Amino acid sequence: MAEKAIDKPSKSTINTIHINNLLPITTEHLDDQDKYLTIDHVKHGAVGYAKYALEHPLKDRLVCTDTSRKKGKYKDSDGNIVSDPEMSSITKKLFLAIKERNSELITEYANDLKVKLDSFGSSNNEMTTEEAEDVTSLTDELIDLVTSIFSQKRQSREISDGLKPDLYHQFVKEIATGSYLSN
């Protein structure tokens, strides 16, 4: 029994090996990955941004070692292991790298929503009361979507400036869960 315990590597050893095998995160790498950010990522807010990050720029480059503290570890451009509490540094770098593309996608999405909204408002057809109520309900939903997407745009900019709005906390929670190093 004691021999089995000795032969089995500890969780700490396995984690260290995994962390040492991470690929480095460079500014160039993050900047190059923005092309993979899609309108679908944007539409899903923090969950979408986290999915993008975990599948593209942070894949094989970041691990979360403590989900409750949201403590991330990654290698910098010099190969040094960086411990990032609350993943604040990497989140800021990531949102700075996608800032322009994200803004373009949000504007595109908002314009699509505005076109839909205008099509409801310019309908020359006579409607029943029920149809009018449906259009009003859909119009309200579209207005809410436009408002929330511009809030998301503002919060994304704030994150790239180092602030921590609601979107930041939701994003980091998703990243921590998705990159947790479990054995």
Residue ranges, per PLM feature:
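Extended amphipathic coiled-coil helices
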Residues: 2-183
